[in-house]
């Protein structure tokens, strides 16, 4: 834990030095532009603690305004997968590179895979785990949607949820394979439960198609 805190402080110091040397363009938190690089950092942000809806809109504005950006630097523990999916689409459309300086976990990996070229800093980590849905959030969704969806009992909802989960897994696998990830590695991304995290070594990331170099 102490080392993690030191690593985060060091990362923030590196970014700060970069700002002083190259100049910084202030944007909506957690985005920062330094020359031709766009930094997306939810780990050292003053406001954003995770990938969130609204970030995809800001990313679109930035990429349209700063057309010289060719690399997205990521440092995030994840967040809302829907927002990550939307940003991944923008990254693919912009045909830019992605680079992990510190940590990229969970939904952040979806964004990372959108990169044309995908690289990892020495000591950087890329983490995978199974998705999850909090019980209270499931209950809230059921109560708000049951009339529109025609769920007469929780069992009707459970049946829908079973099918929807399979569809989401299929969509995720199609995305992984479409971005050049090897089928066997795609299966292994589910090895860690929703409360765990799998950090493959660099060799595994290269052989699995996550890193391009």
Language-model regions, residue ranges each:
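Sec/Tat signal peptide C-region and signal peptidase I cleavage site
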Residues: 22-28
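Cleft-lining beta-strand/loop regions that shape enzyme active-site pockets
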Residues: 31-132
